[in-house]
Structure formats: C-alpha cells, structure tokens
C-alpha cells in the first residue's frame, strides 16, 4: 500500500480557515486553533441571526405602520382588522413602505379599513 502524505491537504485546510478568519482580533486571526473556534462561533451566529432578521424586520414594519395609522386617527390592530374585513391583501412590508413614502395612498387604505370595521369596533 502506498504511503499517503497529507501535508498539502492539511495546509490547504488551515489556509482556508485562516483566510476566512481575516479581520478578527489578535490570535483569532493568526493561530489556526483559535481561528477555527472563532469561525465555528461566527457561523453559529450567522445562522441564528439570519433567522432573527426576519422577525426584526417584521417588528420594524409593524412599528412604522402603527405610527402612520395613529397619525391618521386609528390604532394598528383596528387598521389590520379593517383591512382583513375589506379583503385587502397587502403585506406589512408594502404597508410600511407606503406609510413612509406615500402617505396619501396609506391614508386611503386607512379610510378603507375604517369603513369596513365591524359595528362597535371603531
């Protein structure tokens, strides 16, 4: 059986880890073992935060929509209830975009929601 020399593969593996750890502080960018540990943590944080980002944006959109609806004399939950009753299917991302960039169109949606609220809800 032929002898297998693993120096090339090991060096390549270490080099890729150290290259991806570039920019880290201190030993974490220079020593292989420290860099590898930091890369594992970094990947964990990236994975977690890619999922958390979705909730963060939803909270931001809801905050913006709530502020705009209150300027138009209505609360967020009544606004959403009225839109649902009217059959308007616009997601929160678009509603927040309208609230920031096109206040007249948003005010029209608030009026639609207000007209379609059930009796006693307003």
Curated annotation (Swiss-Prot):
| UniProt superkingdom | Bacteria
Keywords per UniProt:
Ribonucleoprotein, Ribosomal protein, RNA-binding, rRNA-binding
Q: Which GO terms describe its molecular function?
A: rRNA binding; structural constituent of ribosome
Share an example GO biological-process annotation for this protein. Answer: ribosomal large subunit assembly
Q: Name a single GO cellular component.
A: ribonucleoprotein complex
Which protein family is named in the record? Belongs to the bacterial ribosomal protein bL20 family.
What biological function has been recorded for the protein in this entry? Binds directly to 23S ribosomal RNA and is necessary for the in vitro assembly process of the 50S ribosomal subunit. It is not involved in the protein synthesizing functions of that subunit.
**Protein known as:** Large ribosomal subunit protein bL20
Organism (species): Saccharopolyspora erythraea (strain ATCC 11635 / DSM 40517 / JCM 4748 / NBRC 13426 / NCIMB 8594 / NRRL 2338)
User: Which gene name does the record give?
Assistant: rplT
């Amino acid at each position: 059986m032929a002898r297998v020399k693993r120096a090339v593969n090991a060096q390549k593996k270490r080099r890729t880890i150290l290259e991806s750890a570039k920019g880290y502080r201190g030993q974490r960018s220079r020593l292989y073992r420290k860099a590898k540990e930091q890369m594992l943590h970094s990947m964990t944080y990236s994975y977690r935060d890619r999922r958390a980002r979705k909730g963060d944006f939803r909270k931001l959109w809801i905050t913006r929509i709530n502020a705009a609806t209150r300027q138009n004399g209505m609360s967020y939950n009544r606004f959403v209830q009225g839109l649902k009753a009217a059959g308007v299917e616009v997601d929160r991302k678009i509603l927040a975009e309208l609230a920031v960039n096109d206040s007249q169109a948003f005010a029209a949606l608030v009026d639609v929601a207000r007209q379609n609220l059930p009796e006693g809800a307003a």
